[in-house]
């Protein structure tokens, strides 16, 4: 078996957990990962603001019963997740949030 790099291992774990959709903003930290999404069967939905991505992921999970992933960038992008995280928490909605190392 060929060795996986970090990005390939990350995407493989997403597949193992049934992630099919990711919402958010891709920055330079996520470029290598986002390049692997199409082959892995993960659709990325680019949004204008991280908060939108979080709210869309919450709605997607509530309407389908399948977990979605949100992606944010450092700094203000991460703080844009506050409202969607709290909304998902109070509604008991599972959500995977991913941010680059800050």
What do these predicted regions represent?
Residues 1-102:
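N-terminal alpha/beta PP-like core and its mobile active-site loop of ThDP/TPP-dependent enzymes
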């Amino acid at each position: 078996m060929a060795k996986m790099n970090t990005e390939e291992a990350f995407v493989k774990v997403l597949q193992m957990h049934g992630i099919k959709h990711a919402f958010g903003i891709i920055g330079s930290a996520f470029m290598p990962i986002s390049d692997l999404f199409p082959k892995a069967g993960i659709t990325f939905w680019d949004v204008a603001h991280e908060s939108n991505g979080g709210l869309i992921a919450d709605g997607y999970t509530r309407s389908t019963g399948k977990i979605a992933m949100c992606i944010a960038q450092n700094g203000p992008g991460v703080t844009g997740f506050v409202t969607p995280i709290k909304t998902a928490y109070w509604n008991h909605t599972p959500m995977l949030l991913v941010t680059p190392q800050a």
